Regions:
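Beta1/beta-strand and adjacent pyrophosphate-binding region of the FAD-binding site
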Residues: 2-18, 34
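Residue-level marker for well-ordered alpha-helical positions
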Residues: 17-20, 99
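Hydrophobic alpha-helical segments, principally membrane-spanning helices and signal/leader peptides
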Residues: 22, 37-38
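Generic hydrophobic/aromatic pocket-lining and core-packing "Φ" positions
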Residues: 22-23, 102
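Aromatic pocket-lining residues of Rossmann-like dinucleotide-binding sites
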Residues: 26
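Conserved N-terminal/central alpha/beta ligand/cofactor-binding core
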Residues: 32, 38-118
Length: 118
């Protein structure tokens, strides 16, 4: 078995959407990043290729986002799916920050499709 040594600041195991975003953020912050993925090339990216919806706050329709999804509606949806068990301060911070995720993902080559209809 061949052994290699890598000098890295951040080690990420797995190459799904969250892992790839974490790797990009760490690299943008100046860290040396090593991402390990065992999936064959055709399967890399985890479930990202099957993801149909992106949940991010937006106050008006924007290209593929056909309706507004304001902070309060997002918060109420979060309360429903968590049964009300959530930290409001932290949740609202994440909800507000989600408004920039689409442009950040686009900057890194993610392509979005319009919603399905029918």
């Amino acid at each position: 078995m061949k052994t290699e040594a890598f000098d890295t600041d951040v080690l990420i195991i797995g190459g799904g959407n969250a892992a790839l975003c974490a790797a990009l953020m760490a690299r943008e912050a100046g860290s040396r990043v090593l991402l390990l993925e065992s999936a064959p090339r055709a399967w890399r990216g985890g479930n990202s290729s099957h993801t149909r919806n992106l949940r991010c706050m937006h106050d008006a329709p924007q290209d593929v986002l056909v309706e507004a999804y304001p902070e309060e509606e997002y918060w109420q949806d979060l309360l429903k799916v968590t049964g009300g068990i959530t930290n409001e301060h932290l949740a609202r911070m994440v909800i507000r920050a989600s408004s920039t995720c689409r442009s950040w993902m686009r900057k890194h080559g993610v392509h979005f499709q319009p919603p399905l209809s029918g």
